[in-house]
C-alpha cells in the first residue's frame, strides 16, 4: 500500500508535475514532528499558509484526495467531525473512512442528537435549551435543577462543557459557556461509569470506559 499524510488546512504547497509521484514519497510526507501541549495560535497557523486564506481545505488537498483509493480521515474538532469535510468528499465521489456526513452532522449537534434520542424512545438525561443574556445568569443559576451539566451544542472533547458542583459554579459556567458561541443546553448530571460503544453499520463494537481526571 502507498499512503501519504496530508494536513487538511496546510495542504501541500508544491506538487510535482505528476501528483502521483507524491504517493511514492519515502517518508509518506510525514516528517518528524511533535504535538505541542499548548493550544496553537490559530491566526498564526492561518498566516503560515502562502495564500493566508480562511478556507478549510489547504492547497492541493482535494486534488490528492481525488487520486487516492480511499481517504483515511484522522480529523479532530468541529471542522473534521461535523460532516462538512465528509460531504465535500462525497460530492467529489471520494471514498473515505468513518461516519457519513449526515450522521456526523447529527451527532455533532447535541440538541439535534438529543431530539433524535427522545423521538426514538432512547433513555437520555433530562435536558433543555437555554436562551439568556449575561444579566440572566444569576437568576438561572438559582432556577436550574442541580446537579446539572452546562454545554454548548457543538463543542467536542468536552470543550464548552461545565460540571458545576454548586450554584456559584453554575453561575460561572453560565457566563463562561457563552464564549464558545452557538446554542447552549443544560442536562441532568448522571453519576457513574462512562462507557463509549461505537457502532459500525448495524454492528456494536466492544464498550470502552473513559476514566475522568481526578481534580486535585
Q: What feature does the model see in each segment?
A:
Residues 97, 125, 149, 185-187, ...:
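Structural detector of well-ordered beta-strand residues that form the stable sheet scaffold
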Residues 1-102, 106-108, 112, 119, ...:
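ATP-binding N-terminal substructure of ATP-dependent carboxylate-amine bond-forming enzymes
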Residues 66, 122, 144:
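Structured loop/turn residues at beta-strand edges in well-structured enzyme cores
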Residues 117-118, 141-159, 182-195:
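ATP-grasp fold ATP-binding core
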Residues 116-123, 176:
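Basic phosphate/pyrophosphate-binding loop/patch that engages nucleotide-derived ligands
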Residues 77, 158, 210-214:
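Glycine-rich phosphate/pyrophosphate-binding beta-alpha loops
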Residues 165-216:
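Phosphate-binding site of ATP-dependent enzymes
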Residues 125-129, 148-175, 194:
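Glycine-rich phosphate-binding loop of ATP-grasp-fold ATP-dependent ligases
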Amino acid at each position: 500500500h502507498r499512503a501519504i499524510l496530508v494536513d487538511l488546512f496546510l495542504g501541500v504547497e508544491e506538487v510535482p508535475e505528476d501528483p502521483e509521484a507524491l504517493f511514492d514519497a519515502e517518508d509518506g510526507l510525514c516528517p518528524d514532528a511533535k504535538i505541542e501541549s499548548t493550544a496553537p495560535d490559530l491566526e498564526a497557523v492561518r498566516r503560515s499558509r502562502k495564500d493566508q486564506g480562511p478556507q478549510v481545505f489547504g492547497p492541493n488537498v482535494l486534488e490528492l484526495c481525488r487520486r487516492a483509493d480511499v481517504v483515511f480521515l484522522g480529523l479532530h474538532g468541529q471542522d473534521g467531525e461535523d460532516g462538512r469535510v465528509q460531504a465535500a468528499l462525497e460530492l467529489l465521489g471520494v471514498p473515505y473512512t468513518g461516519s457519513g456526513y449526515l450522521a456526523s452532522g447529527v451527532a455533532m449537534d447535541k440538541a439535534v442528537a438529543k431530539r433524535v434520542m427522545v423521538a426514538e424512545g432512547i433513555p437520555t438525561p433530562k435536558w433543555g435549551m437555554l436562551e439568556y443574556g449575561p444579566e440572566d445568569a444569576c437568576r438561572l443559576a438559582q432556577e436550574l435543577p442541580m446537579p446539572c451539566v452546562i454545554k454548548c451544542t457543538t463543542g467536542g472533547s468536552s470543550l464548552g462543557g461545565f460540571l458545576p458542583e454548586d450554584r456559584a459554579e453554575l453561575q460561572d459556567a453560565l457566563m463562561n459557556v457563552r464564549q464558545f458561541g452557538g446554542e447552549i443546553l443544560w442536562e441532568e448530571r448522571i453519576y457513574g461509569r462512562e462507557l463509549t460503544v461505537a457502532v459500525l453499520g448495524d454492528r456494536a463494537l466492544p464498550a470502552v470506559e473513559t476514566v475522568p481526571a481526578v481534580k486535585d
